[in-house]
């Protein structure tokens, strides 16, 4: 099979940007599909570390950096009406058109922000291959979990839950990881760890409260404002993450 994978234009498909869950999804998807012998064409920024048949640059580093600005890249705007998004989407659609056959798959990871790509290629099958977000549009969707699939179903009914049928071909494929990034260590240290975006719904405050009550050390990694009393290590790279988790 042949997959045309559209990366997020405001990141690079490199280890430096793995704090973005959807960029990590793109890299792991490319690695997995190439390992199975499929062809993978990857469309994105100037830098790439994901295994692929061809890497097609559709966004200049100057444009990417200007869009992100002084923000952390995970806080970049997803306003698909901005020229940054319309230009990136148009370029990706044009490059896909030069390479694709009708039976190929177009794989998008940005939800509505990349719908313009699907609209420009109506003769092709566009798949949202990692739906863990709310702005979903495609007829063909792969959800991250059953819980999130049902959230999306319910949200789409506008308060009429009995209308939440979905499609019979909807599927859940849980997130996939590279085992090499999570080494085992028989030697352990005495601490707990939370890693993720530091927003309430991720539960980091619960981790902090539990560790406080137990009198235990808590190491916190991720974007945001850490809780008081925790050792904050910032946004960590895959090597540091692997070491912290292994201990």
Specify the residue positions occupied by each region the protein language model found.
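Catalytic cores of nucleotide-sugar-dependent glycosyltransferases that transfer UDP/GDP/TDP-activated
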Residues: 1-247
């Amino acid at each position: 099979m042949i997959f045309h994978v559209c990366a997020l234009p405001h990141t690079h498909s490199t280890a430096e940007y793995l704090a973005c869950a959807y960029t990590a999804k793109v890299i792991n998807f490319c690695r997995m599909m190439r390992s199975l012998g499929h062809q993978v064409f990857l469309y994105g920024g100037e830098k790439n570390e994901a295994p692929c048949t061809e890497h097609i640059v559709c966004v200049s580093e100057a444009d990417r950096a200007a869009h992100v600005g002084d923000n952390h890249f995970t806080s970049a705007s997803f306003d698909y009406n901005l020229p940054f998004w319309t230009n990136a989407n148009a370029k990706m659609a044009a490059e896909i058109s030069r390479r694709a056959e009708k039976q190929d798959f177009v794989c998008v990871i940005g939800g509505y922000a990349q719908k313009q790509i699907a609209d420009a290629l109506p003769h092709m099958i566009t798949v949202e291959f990692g739906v863990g977000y709310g702005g979903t549009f495609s007829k063909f969707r792969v959800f991250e979990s059953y819980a999130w699939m049902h959230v999306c179903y319910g949200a789409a009914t506008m308060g009429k839950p009995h209308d939440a049928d979905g499609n019979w071909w909807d599927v859940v494929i849980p997130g996939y990881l590279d085992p090499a990034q999570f080494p085992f260590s028989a030697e352990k240290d005495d601490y707990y760890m939370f890693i993720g975006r530091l927003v309430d719904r991720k539960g980091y405050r619960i981790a902090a409260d539990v560790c406080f009550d137990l009198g235990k050390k808590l190491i916190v990694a991720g974007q945001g404002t850490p809780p008081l009393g925790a050792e904050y290590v910032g946004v960590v790279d895959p090597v540091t993450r692997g070491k912290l988790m292994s201990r």
